[in-house]
Each structure stands twice: as structure tokens, then as C-alpha cells.
Design a protein with these regions (language model features):
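Flexible "arm" and connector segments at domain edges
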Residues: 1-78
């Protein structure tokens, strides 16, 4: 486990953004007559930014291999 304060900050911020995205997705699911597209799009962008920060803490080759093994994703795409 990482005890680094920077890792903790990145992990916390990513978690917050993922929860916000989940909240908007649930709202859209529960209220299909309303349009949450813009809010969902914004939250996806926020999650993407924070996820890219977290990726720096981990073995990207191992993650790429996981994607190939689990989903058959072409390594050139990763």
C-alpha cells in the first residue's frame, strides 16, 4: 500500500470524481425523460483526468496486459 501523501491525494480525488459520475449516471437511469448528458460528460472528463494521475503510480505494462487478457484489447490501442 502507498503511504505517500501525493498518492493519497490522487486516490481521494479519483474516488470523489467516480462517485460524482456514478451519481449522474444513476440520475439519468432513474429519470430517462431528463437530459443529464452534459453533466455525465463533464464527470467522465473529470474521472479521466484523475485516473490518468493515478495510473502514474502503477505498472502500465501490467495494466495493458490485463486488458489484453481480460477483454482481448489490442495492445497497440492501449
Amino acid at each position: 500500500m502507498h503511504n505517500n501523501e501525493d498518492w493519497k491525494h490522487d486516490a481521494n480525488k479519483l474516488t470523489e470524481e467516480m462517485l460524482e459520475l456514478a451519481s449522474e449516471l444513476v440520475k439519468q437511469y432513474n429519470k430517462p425523460h431528463k437530459d443529464y448528458h452534459s453533466k455525465i460528460q463533464d464527470e467522465i472528463a473529470d474521472v479521466s483526468y484523475r485516473l490518468n494521475n493515478m495510473i502514474e503510480w502503477y505498472d502500465t505494462k501490467a495494466m495493458a496486459q490485463r486488458m489484453v487478457d481480460k477483454w482481448g484489447v489490442d495492445e497497440d490501442v492501449i
